[in-house]
Amino acid sequence: YLRLDGGVAPIYSEHLKDCPLSTDELFEAGQRNTDRAPLLHRGPIGAGAWALHGEGFFTASKAANLGAVLDEIDVGADAGVLFCLPHKHVLGLHPIDPGDPYWALKSMALLHCEETERHVDPMLSPFIFHRAPTGEVEAVAIPGGVVYDDPRVLILPAPLFDAILDAAGCESTPVR
């Protein structure tokens, strides 16, 4: 996005033809700006879940540098973390408990459903993602609504998260 006096606007390739910076340099500058974007809230929101909320367009973009975010807030993500990006103003995350990985999944499904139901912005991503301790990221589920306060999710094939479920003795049914 290009910052203007009246707000921001998307940048298209025709805007870049006379730009003295390379695409990589522009991405690095954008990531620095994203990392510096102020937050209204950064902290626990209950039951092990964390959320980063901001008014800017780039709060959800902090997921591109999730390793740095995890280092800053020290959530204890030794077994990995699940995260979601329901809209541009929030990044939700929950460290995985290797003994009960479904707890983090339910937590992120509930956060995703609550945020998309009560926020005026369109949904950014329908997925819940897993970030392994190695930094690898995979989509693991799609929230499908809440039935009697119990979030329903469609579990996707995700080899790294499936291994965590198997190690915990959890059943990886397609709908949970």
Describe the predicted segments one by one.
Residues 46-47, 74-76:
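Generic structural signal for short, solvent-exposed loop/turn connectors between secondary structure elements
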Residues 59-74:
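Short amphipathic alpha-helix segments
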Residues 77-176:
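C-terminal structured domains
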Residues 22-26, 61-65, 100-107:
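Short amphipathic alpha-helical segments
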Residues 26-33, 69-72, 167:
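Residues that form generic nucleotide/phosphate-binding pockets
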Residues 1-61:
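Charged, alpha-helical interface segments at or near domain boundaries
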